[in-house]
Design a protein with these regions (language model features):
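Short amphipathic alpha-helix with an adjacent loop that forms part of the alpha/beta core around
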Residues: 62-64, 86
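A conserved catalytic-core signature of glycosyltransferases
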Residues: 56, 112-114, 143
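Short aromatic/hydrophobic "clamp" motif used to bind/position activated sugar donors
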Residues: 70
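Conserved donor-nucleotide/metal-binding helix-loop-beta segment in metal-dependent transferases, i.e.
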Residues: 78-111
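N-terminal anchoring/stem segment of glycosyltransferases
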Residues: 1-52, 65-66, 121
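Catalytic core and acceptor-binding pocket of nucleotide-sugar-dependent glycosyltransferases
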Residues: 116-184
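Glycine-rich, basic loop-to-helix element that forms the pyrophosphate-binding segment
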Residues: 53-60
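Short, polar loop motifs at secondary-structure junctions
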Residues: 27-36, 75-83, 163-166
Length: 184
């Protein structure tokens, strides 16, 4: 299984990337490989600059990136089960079952969460739209979750019990997304 993650800037440590070696072959798209295990395949930056770091995830859909079966994981996820159950050929993301729909606003909140994604056929159209409309996208959209959902790109969603948000689940999920204030 090929795991893919993104590490830009100093927010997250190399140890968070290295922990994924326990689960499969690891690829890391990063601007700083210091401290990463030699067993991790480093993907060099494409040269795009984003004020909002989350947008570096969209570079993963560039035609220049490897077109292989990947399971993408944010660095701060907790893993409790068999990651193979999350592998999908079509672009798949979690639906945020744990969020109240009353939290949604037109632009800033979404029912998607890109903390976990899987694909074989990467959604190049998402990357191309961003590159061709960069000023609009980076001005208008506060993150990639609402951008992907509101722009109506094609995606599938995981079944509810597979991915949960910390403290929101009754049955232990395979992946647990952590609260922002606990990400280190």
């Amino acid at each position: 299984m090929k795991l893919l993650t993104v590490k830009f800037g100093e927010k997250y440590s190399s140890q968070l990337v290295n922990k994924f070696l326990n689960y499969g072959e690891v690829y890391c798209y990063t601007d700083n490989a210091n401290g990463l295990s030699r067993d991790i395949t480093i993907i060099e930056p494409l040269g795009n600059k984003y004020k909002i770091p989350y947008f570096y995830k969209i570079d993963l859909f560039s035609p220049q990136m490897p077109n292989e079966q990947f399971l993408y994981l944010d660095l701060d996820v907790n893993i409790y089960g068999d990651l193979h159950k999350l592998i999908r050929e079509e672009f798949t993301v979690p639906y945020a079952y744990w969020r109240s729909k009353s939290e949604m606003t037109k632009y800033t909140r979404t029912m998607l969460n890109t903390g976990v994604m899987s694909w074989y056929n990467k959604p190049v159209e998402i990357y191309e739209y961003l590159i061709n409309n960069k000023k609009e996208v980076l001005t208008f959209w506060p993150g990639i979750d609402p951008f992907i959902e509101k722009m109506l790109f094609d995606y599938n969603v995981y079944e509810e019990h597979l991915i949960g948000f910390e403290g929101s689940w009754n049955v232990k999920p395979i992946i647990e997304l952590r609260k922002k204030d606990e990400r280190k």
